[in-house]
Design a protein with these regions (language model features):
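Acidic/His- and Gly-rich active-site-bordering loop/insert found
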Residues: 3-112
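Short, conserved phosphate/pyrophosphate- and ester-handling motifs at nucleotide-, phospho-/glycolipid
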Residues: 115
Length: 115
């Protein structure tokens, strides 16, 4: 840390997030690679939703599934202890771009939205 820098102080929730990410780094990378190579089009992400829900459960996080067709919520703090709530939103649907280098041959979908 540079001499003038203020140290970053994390609260309990922030530290819990960092710890989960650090402890599961390789699993997170493998998950991302798997989703990338098995792209599914919007409202048809059934494999993706199931894989995400199972991944969150493996991390010990309670989930709610089948929200708005393929949506999944995972709770870091389901009981809202200390009035803290956290949302992580990710769009995991793909665009139909069959000519893309990494397009899923089954769905012709590719993750190349850029958002």
């Amino acid at each position: 840390m540079a001499q003038n820098e203020t140290p970053i102080i994390l609260d309990e929730t922030e530290q819990k997030i960092i710890n989960i990410i650090d402890a599961h780094r390789d699993q997170i990378i493998d998950f991302a690679k798997d989703i990338y190579t098995h792209a599914e089009l919007g409202y048809k992400e059934f494999r993706t939703a199931e894989k995400f829900a199972n991944f969150m459960k493996d991390l010990g996080l309670p989930t709610k599934e089948h929200l708005a067709v393929t949506g999944v919520k995972a709770y870091l703090n389901e009981e809202k202890k200390d009035n803290v709530s956290l949302a992580l939103i990710g769009e995991l649907d793909a665009l139909r771009i069959p000519e893309h280098k990494y397009a899923n041959p089954e769905t012709q979908g590719a993750h190349c939205c850029g958002h």
